[in-house]
C-alpha cells in the first residue's frame, strides 16, 4: 500500500471506514479478553502536541504499548517546531526516525504541510477544523450499541466546530442524516454546508432537531483557545443544553455522546452523563481501540501478524 495519511474522514473510503470500525470493535473484545497482540514490536509513534489533551495522549500511547511498540511525546518545548523551524524541515527529520506520527495542533494547514513532507503516515489527532479520530470512536460506539448508522438520524447540538465538521463528513461517508442545531452565527462553515447539503441541514429549534433522532451529540460551548468568549457563548447557547427530557423527543433507541471533557450544567444537564441512554464512557474508551485499528491500517504493510 502506498503512503496513506488520516487528516480527515474523507481520506478513507466508505468501505475502509466501515472495515476499520469493525476491526476496532474486534480489538476491543481482544483487549477485554486479555489476548496479547503485538504487531508493532520495534515500531515507534511520534506524538506531537501543540494542544494539550488527556484522552488523546493516553489512548495513543497506551495503544502503541499494547501493540508492542513505543511512543514519544513531543510538546512545543521538546521540538524545534516551538522555536520556529519550518514544518517541512521538522517533518522530514522526525519522519526519518519514527514509523508513524500523530499531531494535535491548531491550524489544519499544519498537519497538511507535515503530511506533504513526511515519509511516514500522519494522523490528525485534532485541529481547529477537524477531529476525525473522535468520529472513529463515535461510529464504533454506535455500531456496538445499535448496529449500522446508515440511514439513521443524528442530531448535533451546539457550536458548528471541528467536531461538527467531522460529523458532517461522517454523514457523507457513513450515509446518515445530520441535523445541526446551532444558534445564529455559530453554524458550521458555509463551504462545508454547501458540500454536504445532501445529508446535512440546519435546524435552529433544538426540540425539532431532536425529533426521531437516533443519536444526539454535543460538545463544550467554548473550545480550547476560546476561553475569552466563554461568557458570550454561555448566553448564546443557554437554550442549547442537552437534557434527558430532550432525549425523550428522540427515537426510543436514541443514544447520547459527548467527546469530553464535559461541563455539567452548561452544554449538558448535571444528570445527562448518568442517563441510561448515555454511552459516553464506552465512547471515551473506544478512542483507544479505534486509534489502534487506524494505526494498524496505516502500517499494515509493515506489521508482524
Curated annotation (Swiss-Prot):
Catalytic activity, EC: 2.1.3.3
Reactions catalysed: carbamoyl phosphate + L-ornithine = L-citrulline + phosphate + H(+)
Kindly give the Pfam families that the UniProt entry links to this protein.
Answer: OTCace, OTCace_N
Residues that bind carbamoyl phosphate, according to the entry?
Answer: 53-56, 80, 104, 131-134, 259-260, 287
InterPro entries in UniProt: Asp/Orn_carbamoyltranf_P-bd (IPR006132), Asp/Orn_carbamoylTrfase (IPR006130), Asp/Orn_carbamoylTrfase_sf (IPR036901), Asp_carbamoyltransf_Asp/Orn-bd (IPR006131), Orn/put_carbamltrans (IPR002292), OTCase_ArgI (IPR024904)
- Pathway(s) annotated for this protein in UniProt: Amino-acid biosynthesis; L-arginine biosynthesis; L-arginine from L-ornithine and carbamoyl phosphate: step 1/3
Listed binding positions for L-ornithine are: 162, 219, 223-224
Protein location: Cytoplasm
A single GO CC term for this protein reads:
cytoplasm
Q: State the UniProt keywords alphabetically.
A: Amino-acid biosynthesis, Arginine biosynthesis, Cytoplasm, Transferase
Listed under GO biological process in this entry are: arginine biosynthetic process via ornithine; citrulline biosynthetic process; L-arginine biosynthetic process
Which GO molecular function terms does the record list?
amino acid binding; ornithine carbamoyltransferase activity
Function in brief: Reversibly catalyzes the transfer of the carbamoyl group from carbamoyl phosphate (CP) to the N(epsilon) atom of ornithine (ORN) to produce L-citrulline.
Q: Please name the PANTHER family in this protein's record.
A: ORNITHINE CARBAMOYLTRANSFERASE, MITOCHONDRIAL, ORNITHINE TRANSCARBAMYLASE, MITOCHONDRIAL
Q: What does the sequence similarity comment in the record state about its family?
A: Belongs to the aspartate/ornithine carbamoyltransferase superfamily. OTCase family.
Q: What is this protein called?
A: Ornithine carbamoyltransferase
| Species, as recorded | Psychrobacter cryohalolentis (strain ATCC BAA-1226 / DSM 17306 / VKM B-2378 / K5)
